[in-house]
Amino acid sequence: LIFVSLPRISNESSMTQDNSIVIREYLTTDKEVVMNLIKLNTPNFFAKEEVNDLSNYLDKEIELYYVLLVDGKVVGCGGINFAEKRTIGKISWDIMHPDYQGKSLGKKLLRYRIEVLKAIPSIKKITVRTSQLAYKFYEKQGFTLNEIKRNYWADGFDMYSMQYNEL
């Protein structure tokens, strides 16, 4: 076990001040809404084959996973996994409700997880594997493209392997 002091989340966002934004750890009771989020983003951002992959991840592979709530409603989620004796932090399974995309909430959730990883002394590298549909988002947040594997996730869904530059 590793204990990390988690960064505080402010309520600042590009949304109106009436909106309360909270990031908290995923609970198993969140699974249904998280699964609905991926379905809402399929096939625009995820291949249909990935829906079952996410379910398996939530049941068996989850390490750190968070949900983002606006006014008490889960509208986004994303995780962290570890590799190479916890020296690599891997950003995983970022999903945002389509109605809440483009409002800086995905950026807020990503930044939160980057801060969590920066607070872990053993972390030397932060990576993400995404697709051609979302890699520009990570590029804007300080990630650099390292490799592309065509049709990796599914037919027409390439894998873009990226690394965070500001660690």
Please provide the spans of the model-predicted regions.
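Active-site rim helix/loop that mediates acceptor-substrate recognition in acyltransferases
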Residues: 44-66, 70, 79
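Conserved beta-strand in the GNAT
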Residues: 67, 73-81, 88-95
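A short beta-loop-alpha structural element at the N-terminal edge
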Residues: 20-34
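Conserved catalytic-core motifs of GNAT/GCN5-like acyltransferases
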Residues: 127-129, 139, 144-161
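Conserved GNAT acetyl-CoA-binding A-motif
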Residues: 117-130
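Helix-loop element at the rim of GNAT/NAT acetyltransferase active sites that forms part
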Residues: 25, 35-49
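A conserved beta-turn-beta hairpin within the catalytic core of GNAT-like acetyltransferases
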Residues: 82-92, 101, 120-122, 156-158
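Conserved acetyl-CoA-binding loop-helix of GNAT-fold acetyltransferases
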Residues: 96, 102-115
